[in-house]
Amino acid sequence: MSMVYLASGDSNANIEYQTISSTATQQLTQEQSERLHDRITKAQLQKLYDLFKSSPDQMVGYSELRHMLEDVDITFTDYTYTRLFLKINQNSDFMIDWNEFVSYLIFGFQEEDPSSQKEALTMPISAPPVVRKTEHRSAVCCITLLKVKSDQTPMEEIPELSANYSFGGEDSPENSGMWVTASREGQLRFWSAHMEPLRSAVSESSNLPYAVYCMSYAFYNNGKTHSKLVLGDYAGNVRILSYSPYLRGPFQAKPGAALVELVWADVLKGRIPLLIPREHINLHSELISCVYYSLHMNTLFASAEYRNTKKYRGRCPGLIMVSNDDRNNFRIPLGVSVFYVAESKNILVTGGPDTFVRIWDVYISSEPSAILTGHNGGIVAVFVQPEENKVYSVDYHKVIKVWDLQEHTLLQTFGELVRIIHHSETDIKYYYHSHLRDLLVAGRKLIQIKCCPRVRVDLTDGNTHAAPVSVVLYNRLFRNIVTCGLDSYIIVWDPWTGRRKIIMKNCHTKMIYGEIIDIEITAACFDPLEQFLLTGARDGSLKIWNYNNAVVVRNMSIQPDQEVTAVIWVIDRILAMGWDRQVTEFNDVAGREYGDPKKWAKFHTDDITCADVKLGEGVVTATYSGEIIFWKLETGQPYRRYNVMNPYQFIELKLNTEEEKLTRRSKRISSLMGAGRRTLVLQNFKPDEIKDYGANIPVSVQAVLFLQKRPMTKDHGSVFISLDTGYIQVYSHHQHGGFIKQFFAVHKVGDCVLTMASDRKNRFLYTGTAFGYIKIWHIVNYCIPQAEKTEVCMPRLRLDFIFLRKDLFLTRAKRVIRNQPEPMLVSSYKGHLKAINSIGFINLPKILFTGSHDYSCRLWTQGGRYLGTLGTVLPWSKLTPFERAGEDNRAYRLPPDIKKVASSTTLKVISGIQHTGTVKRAKAVDEREDERDVEEAASDVKNMFDRPLREPILGHHFQLPGRSVIEQRIDLDTTELCIPVYTHLRVYPSEMMEHLPTPPVIGQVRAENYLDHYMPVVGKVDPHDSAINIREPQKRAKAGSSSLLPARAGYSLGKPKTNSVLGMPRSSGAGLCKPRTSFTLSDYTPGNPKADFSSRNMKSNLSSGSPKAGIPKADSSHGSAKASCRLGSPKPDYISIKKRASFSPGTTPKTDFSPKAGKPKTNTMKSSNSH
């Protein structure tokens, strides 16, 4: 497109819109920059100022500014100067004053400020805390980290730039270490870095003059410096133990001693040569609250609290720094509770009971360099992240505040600990893991908080936004990429360096109940000259931005609480459409910007989902119900209407007032049910025949695209319509045109195209799907007359797109379209894990960019090579707007998240490497060699044995036994060249099994019948009572009984209590067998299973009943219960039967008067089968 604007009074000065395009027809021989910042000097700037002041009205036009720059020896080509003039002219009046000129220079220098790159997209503490139980009996009183790598690093080993990313190695135990928690009962618990319990131990007190309150340990990883163990006690003394870490120093294991105890007096006398002690007696007059030893500075830091203000009068040495014999006192009111030393920054951060956080220079103790105020309680923990320039402080009320170390400003206040920890818990311990960037909070719970964690580059390349990316645009004037997200952020990126130039937060907001809520940005576009940005939000608001300085130029709105789904900015007009089902037109003419907007006729019956425009010809809009309407751009009148379910049907453009009323009423009803739910469309106009419009037309339109180079004829397909079924329909926007063709654009069930784009000449169609796939279609000869079709050079396409090269097998993306001749699919690969919401193309460098629901915006070459993710922490690829990307034939890497789920097609396209069939042929050669070796080995065996053995090898007089359950390992003799296997087979002779006699006890039990011992029960049912009236049977003695069963054993010698209906015993105590007082195992022999069964039977009979039913009472007249057992010895053994069941409360266990024991023993039934 080409539009001409009159720049000034000079009629020869014309500015064409096409000149701002990166694909201008001018052939650029070399890269030219229109930046003045690198070429202008102070003297030249002063001369330009004088020229501006001498100009009429202190304003200059297009040609005047060029002459002024040439007067100060600054020259540009016509193409470069036109771009420069449009960048400076922010008011779009083609007249520049001194303020505009200086503002352009100021904003350019601000873009080069490194501090602008440090602003984070998310808060330092954005992840929810992890909470788990401590597994201690009481609250944790101490917490520390058992680590292998030290936090202190020699200065010569510290890198100049600390990387804000990691490769995942910090999760290893060697790097992360183990957490150790202790409680007041003396219990220690060891935890992994991810708070998984490992083991527990018990601590003991040491023999020191005073109890130790705090400790610190300093060491280097290289082991070249003596390690320091610092102890601070309750009396204000500090003791230092120094030793060499070579061969573990004093911690060497000694044979026979699992624990080595040391007495401090022996350490002072030098009886332990490996330890070098040093004492600082009465360093403070109060207890030592915190200690630290810096190996780099060879300095000891010790702090104490001085809460007695009357005694110290505010001049207390809260922190003392001891270096050799020199002492420096940091005098702070009320003393210091905690401090942190950042050696790389040479700063010291202190916190105390006075609620202030002070930042000191380590070498200046007279006054702090900054005082951070904002806490309402005493400071109990502080730590610093030097690589992020952040200071974290925690107060007594469990509120965490994050501060900027350079600007000394508050970044975040995190108060989730107040909700998680009960208010009665005040003694909370904190420890910061500097390697993992975790803050561990310990009380009665363990809480792990991520503090500005590093980016795991082995899992992701980073994020572009803090929420899904909704719109990605390329500005051809400033040559940058603008991304808008659902986090209400607008970010300007330099795609050639990967740097973030400008970030605008909280762009669309709304106040609800006094709280400011961010509104998601859902649509955006540029003005015709691409100097301003128009954004639309989910609440119906519209804003025009001068995004180079983050200034809102104008505010607009469609109907309230109606999402804006598409915005179009043409000359002098702005079109916005969305859930209000109509097109709203705003004026963009100077002097008429703030008039009432114009509402186009409401012909749609459902929410508008997408729209596109072709300058000078028309606008197309599509709805959620599948309606498509073509409008005249000049008049705003519709001229064609289609439905995607039946695109050949003619639909009359008729607006009924009754339909509009019913539609408005349904809209109000649906708004009450929630803004996220789609409205019900009323098709019939009669109230008694209201039907759901979505039931008849379930297919919705996801995206529309106008091909700008296709002419407006009925034979040219100029509009592409994407449906949620995966198809793309092609229409002609001519008055007599209509539906032409359709093709299937996805290869997975349930997938659909969400966004489309094309290059400047409409040769390729770029699509992004809901499953994260990027597909490129060759549409040069698609839906055009036969006479205009051109020949396609397939070798050239195969060079550009590796997807077209032949594969060993037909991949899934190719199988779906094998019967679809046009359009030709030239590339298909997975670019994101989630849906692609926006896609665009930069023509001259042939770069494709995509914005996805996975918070990232990625750049690709046209062939599918991965260039990078905007916002990544990794080094950026070298790109230029004047050279084609991806022509250096280097190895391109894959996104880490895609690498784990990529198919063979995606791996081939992104990496640019196709494996040929040479590997298969080499493998066949190896297989032939293996077969040749097998044949040679078989021939050697044949030659050794002269002739092969005949089947059956073992003859007909032997039958192989069944396979044993137990695995029998065969040890072969491998000393000989060949092993006859059959000589090693184990053959066992068959023997007859000996039938063992059955013990009399078993036979007697088997012959018994329960009917001999139980009699029928006489009873009747009383309907007025709640139980069965059963008459007790009369007791009778059985002749010849060996013993009498007591009544408390639960048995009666007569009729037992039974159920009157079933005739079964009512007591659940015993089984069906008659209990016995003694038993004899006289026939027991080793290996007799039947004899062993008697003991098990007795065990089951005794254990299945009640505690009293199965155990006979010992009778002194008959002696004790005896059981003789023949186990090879003539003398019988006495076996005491113990009861295994537990006694009920309140009962007294029975005793066993065993002659072998000599005294009564408690009967706990114990029957063993170990005989």
Curated annotation (Swiss-Prot):
Residues 1094-1106, 1161-1171 have a biased composition (Polar residues). Keywords: Repeat, WD repeat. Residues 1076-1171 are annotated as: Disordered. InterPro entries: EF-hand-dom_pair, WD-EF-hand_domain, WD40/YVTN_repeat-like_dom_sf, WD40_repeat_dom_sf, WD40_rpt. PROSITE patterns: WD_REPEATS_1, WD_REPEATS_2, WD_REPEATS_REGION. SUPFAM superfamilies: EF-hand, WD40 repeat-like. Transmembrane segments: none annotated. WD repeats lie at residues 157-201, 331-370, 374-413, 464-503, 516-555, 603-643, 748-787, 831-870. This is WD repeat-containing protein on Y chromosome. It comes from Drosophila grimshawi (Hawaiian fruit fly).
